[in-house]
């Protein structure tokens, strides 16, 4: 019996097959550039080998789901003899709104509530819903489990999640901070507890999930206490293509200046801003560092703006945790690999006893390795931990659907 895990992005579809009885990963893959002229399909086998090919553009997520099942059935690894071997499907869903405080087994009522939440995540939830409905048609008798990035942050208190807007906006329209990257933060919190040999209930962390999308999470007593992303993933840190925090008046101002509607301006803030917007070169940090080596000013400025924002958030989260922090933890593609970003983000904190070991930090560039990168005398541990959202989804699946099914 097999478990299929699906992670839909706005233009991508990640998937993995696990053996139900022992949680062993059998195969994984990703379909990228959905809705574009050429799509990319990558298959990652258990031996680490990768096969990659280009195909004529896959037009939408339902077609991508159909393609995924064909790939799994036709794989040289013979993982599946029959599609009916898949009995459970776990979905990563970005936004659960106010409805979902935990992962749930799919029911019609849950799907209706998820559709209602889509207005809060128009860039992310529609693709997840399309995947869920397509799987429902192909495997109608399989159990589907919905795992939400927002659920982890349901422990944030009202004074931290409310915006200072009319209270009726919250009561009538659920306008509030929700936060994201929750599956990642849940995993990293558990791993930090194991590494530090400290019970989760007594654990205070500042976790930075730094990738093309980026956020920061204050964890108090093992639970989410505050986070930088808001009602959507646009708020907070400077990201690959997202602006992060801005004065909201800019939206109407630039709408008038550029003669664009507010939806178009929001699209620019989501897809043409951040590192890409400032550098006018790339949203890929590898490209940015290359441009900096060439002496390119705007790329250097983009990194300065990004790491300055990160440093501000770290400082404020140290304060709200009452200066009682067990570890600062970096995760995500940039957080685990980019030692220069870590160094810039933590520069100056040695004055309050948070000391980065520069040599250890420089050595920690492997996306698959956990590292402790603080000095021996640092009052706060500094860690780099690769995230594993699939592990959190698997754990939630087994909690909802026991192994003696």
Curated annotation (Swiss-Prot):
Locate the coiled-coil region(s) and give their ranges.
none
Pathway of action: Metabolic intermediate biosynthesis; acetyl-CoA biosynthesis; acetyl-CoA from acetate: step 1/2
Molecular-function annotations in GO:
acetate kinase activity; ATP binding; magnesium ion binding
Which reaction does this enzyme catalyse, per its entry? acetate + ATP = acetyl phosphate + ADP
Q: What is the organism field in this record?
A: Borrelia garinii subsp. bavariensis (strain ATCC BAA-2496 / DSM 23469 / PBi) (Borreliella bavariensis)
Q: Does the keyword DNA-binding apply?
A: no
BP terms from Gene Ontology: acetate metabolic process; acetyl-CoA biosynthetic process
Gene Ontology, cellular component aspect: cytoplasm
Which residues are substrate-binding?
Answer: 92
Q: Which InterPro entries match?
A: Ac/propionate_kinase (IPR004372), Aliphatic_acid_kin_short-chain (IPR000890), Aliphatic_acid_kinase_CS (IPR023865), ATPase_NBD (IPR043129)
What family classification does the UniProt entry report for this protein? Belongs to the acetokinase family.
The record's function comment reads: Catalyzes the formation of acetyl phosphate from acetate and ATP. Can also catalyze the reverse reaction.
Task: Name the positions where Mg(2+) binds.
Answer: 7, 389
How it assembles, according to the record, is: Homodimer.
Q: What keywords tag this UniProt record?
A: ATP-binding, Cytoplasm, Kinase, Magnesium, Metal-binding, Nucleotide-binding, Transferase
The record describes how the cofactor is bound as:
Mg(2+). Can also accept Mn(2+).
- The protein, known as: Acetate kinase
Annotated compartments: Cytoplasm
Site feature Transition state stabilizer: at which residues? 181, 242
Residues where ATP binds: 14, 209-213, 284-286
Q: What is its EC number?
A: 2.7.2.1
